[in-house]
Amino acid sequence: MLKFYKMGIKRLSGEMTMGEERMDLGIEFETTEEIPVPERLIDQVIGQDHAVEVIKTAAKQRRHVLLIGEPGTGKSMLGQAMAELLPTEDLEDILVFPNPEDENMPRIKTVPAGQGRRIVEEYKRKAKEQENIRFYLLFFVFFIVAMAVFMSRGDPNTLLLGVFVILIALMVTANMRFRTQAMVPKLLVDNSGRKRAPFVDATGAHAGALLGDVRHDPFQCFSGEETVVIRENGEVKVLRLKDFVEKALEKPSGEGLDGDVKVVYHDFRNENVEVLTKDGFTKLLYANKRIGKQKLRRVVNLEKDYWFALTPDHKVYTTDGLKEAGEITEKDELISVPITVFDCEDEDLKKIGLLPLTSDDERLRKIATLMGILFNGGSIDEGLGVLTLKSERSVIEKFVITLKELFGKFEYEIIKEENTILKTRDPRIIKFLVGLGAPIEGKDLKMPWWVKLKPSLFLAFLEGFRAHIVEQLVDDPNKNLPFFQELSWYLGLFGIKADIKVEEVGDKHKIIFDAGRLDVDKQFIETWEDVEVTYNLTTEKGNLLANGLFVKNSGGLGTPAHLRVEPGMIHRAHKGVLFIDEIATLSLKMQQSLLTAMQEKKFPITGQSELSSGAMVRTEPVPCDFILVAAGNLDTIEKMHPALRSRIRGYGYEVYMRTTMPDTVENRRKLVQFVAQEVKKDGRIPHFTRDAVEEIIREAQRRAGRKGHLTLRLRDLGGVVRAAGDIAVRKGKKYVTREDVLEALQMAKPLEKQLADWYIERKKEYQVIRTEGGEIGRVNGLAIIGEQSGIVLPIEAIVAPAASKEEGKIIVTGKLGEIAREAVLNVSAIIKRYKGEDISRYDIHVQFLQTYEGVEGDSASISVATAVISALEEIPVRQDVAMTGSLSVRGEVLPVGGVTPKIEAAIEAGIKKVIIPKANEKDVFLSPDKREKIEIIPVERIDEVLEVALVESEKKKELIKRIRETLPLGVSESAGSETLHEHGRDSGSALSVEESKA
């Protein structure tokens, strides 16, 4: 037996030694600079010869293709290569036109590539000509009216008639302008100047992006600080927009995406909620909150007395018609609608003309100044009986004078202490000021909503507040802090930055508000603000009043239907390639729609999401004659829509992507080309020397996991190329050398490899992995994490009297998968055969130590068998030996996958010997330094495993003799080798990591 081991090691070492000699790469070169890189992508595909031929045929015959295989094998590259092979002469532009007969069914027209732009430009030119005609017509009307007024010598009737004619002319020309703009078509798909057919990657696309969508009129949003008037179930409330929307979104109706911005909305269509607009209240449809990077244009026009903070595309009503907020200038006059600020049933206040008080009342500025004074030094008591103001004498006198102007004579008293104090108990004054939002003792400070209607009112409030530095000592800063934050935001509209600090003073808090200068020296102030959140409301009439300004909202749909149509990826891929990776992740509904598009070669565009304008807009069928290149893994086939797969299979090809290719000179030459391609594609790393390329090819041999093969998981291999290039750049080298590649292999370890190293280090530290001595029932198994990372997997077994008198059980713990559990049961057949006695008297417990994330596969079979036999026979197992291999019920050791990374894990754990299946002998690729650290023992039968693994003793010799006598051994060397999968892994031999959470 000892002689057999030595021969095996010699053969294995001899093969690896040959690998160290200068490798035949099929081409002579010093660096990859000398290697020509093909121009066409199809010629850059490495190792997938069958797939390449299929793609060439499919491109010529316009067939669909389904590519199935593991990640990183070139599926996307083949899709792009197909696009290069398609002719460009057949490319078309697609335009969408308005439909005069039905505006909700825009018309579709296709023209040869390049003509679409010319058609749109021609329509724009005609629209501009009509705009000039409009201007000349207006000029002519003004001239005629002016002449008529002049000839009539100022006759009032003529003047009135002239004004009427001018208004009619303005209305007619405005409508003409809208109609001419609405007639300009939209270019949906522009293929002008294309030198190759379209390639569209639709991986992970949502329904609107894949199939096309009819977008909402641009979401026109507010800052949220604006005031709106809401009527809910008959009760009228004045609320800050932000507060209203946030409360509604406590119960959201849904959410979606508008580009990179998340939209959350509440549906009010079935609720009795209305919003005030120019002509009274209108039904509220939706309240929306948009989360994401956005810009607000903030404008203050002191001359025209308005301000706003809106997204640039928000439409505002001006005296010249609708304008976007981004286009408003200082000359524009915005339409402001008077709002009732305060009204109640009080005869005394009505007698002196203070009720009803509207936003256009001239006295409101004086009242705002009173409020500012009161907010800085006064309040009304909780019982609403006394108004108290503590301030300077001059301020008190100004306050009293203004009150007398509004209310006439009233009773008050002034107390002179450290500060002058004014007190009044006049019920008219108190009721009036409370109704307008005056500060009340014990309640939170809130800026009066009507002060925010106009900049003139805010400045009047600020004049009364007057102090640019305020310090307040309070018990709870959260009560007054929002007031100062809101004040700071409105000061920001004027370009004034205010600082707010909260300091602890004993058991109280001091709020410090510092606004610096409060001077405003410009009449028109414009600022831009980057925000993360905006708000808007959608109403039935498409408009509302915000801070008294008449503005449009997102429900108006003022943009013509055809301009809101957005093409889907299926339309942009017309006459080209539509690539979808992981196609099974598409919903069945989307797969069904994709099937329809493939069959009909046309697909109408309609609303696909909550954020579209809905299904009322539906275009004529839009051409989408694409070639589908779908991709996925093996489980993709099960999850695909059966009809979609049938369509591809019936009208195209299904291709399985190879994961390895034979290790021939020709294929090595292809890998040399691959390295040169990766360097050229990256553009930031130097070329590789011949030695460096050899090391890359050795890594390809190792990663193949099969004797005489090279890996085709070239994305991962490309990662090694780039990592080595980065190292060479860091060192300032002209070329990448072998040392750089070796360093890259250490530095750019996969996550699984890093976890495996950490796992081994930790288990050794806590002595979970043992590498010395012998123990009964304990074996060091080997497993795989991910694709290429090995790990030592301790397995323990004990034998106990059966809990049931009827039968014994094999009890396995360690979160085993189905294949692993069945493999353990197979071990019992061998035990029963050699034991020669009824083992139903025993319960056999097998534990895979600390495998929290589970174990799958049958590569631990010989480890389990060894542990159980050791426990039954009470023979210790050597702890400096690790093993991997599948086991048949006849006692044959069958091949498994990943033997190289498993052996590397054993080396790192400090193990001296490793047992592997004989069939995997030539699958081992180790560097010379690693090979010196371990003895590799290939075996074919379970008795050979026990010969190596068990500690020498008389019981061991008797056991092995019994096994050889009872088991049907003596199989050929190649037995079972066909069970090794092409991708180098046993049937599920994998460990999805343990301890990642520990």
Swiss-Prot record:
The signal peptide, as residue positions, is none
Which residues does the UniProt record annotate as the domain DOD-type homing endonuclease? 370-496
Q: Where is this region: Disordered?
A: 971-998
Catalytic positions?
859, 902
Q: Pfam families from the entry?
A: Lon_C, LonB_AAA-LID, Mg_chelatase, Sigma54_activat
- Sequence ranges on the Cytoplasmic membrane side: 1-131, 177-998
The answer to whether keyword Zinc applies is no
Biological process, per Gene Ontology:
intein-mediated protein splicing; intron homing; protein catabolic process; regulation of DNA-templated transcription
Q: Which InterPro entries match?
A: Hint_dom_N, Hint_dom_sf, Intein_C, Intein_endonuc_central, Intein_N, Lon_arc, Lon_proteolytic, Lon_Prtase
Q: What is its EC number?
A: 3.4.21.-
Q: Which domain of life is it from?
A: Archaea
**Topology feature Extracellular, residues:** 153-155
Q: Name a GO molecular-function annotation.
A: ATP-dependent peptidase activity
Post-translational modification as stated in the protein's UniProt record: This protein undergoes a protein self splicing that involves a post-translational excision of the intervening region (intein) followed by peptide ligation.
Major localization listed first in the record, in broad terms? membrane
Give every Lon proteolytic domain span. Answer: 773-952
UniProt entry keywords in alphabetical sequence: ATP-binding, Autocatalytic cleavage, Cell membrane, Endonuclease, Hydrolase, Intron homing, Membrane, Nuclease, Nucleotide-binding, Protease, Protein splicing, Serine protease, Transmembrane, Transmembrane helix
Describe the function of this protein: ATP-dependent serine protease that mediates the selective degradation of mutant and abnormal proteins as well as certain short-lived regulatory proteins. Degrades polypeptides processively.
PANTHER family per UniProt: ATP DEPENDENT LON PROTEASE FAMILY MEMBER
Question: How does it associate, per the subunit comment?
Answer: Homohexamer. Organized in a ring with a central cavity.
Protein's recorded name: Archaeal Lon protease
Native source species: Pyrococcus abyssi (strain GE5 / Orsay)
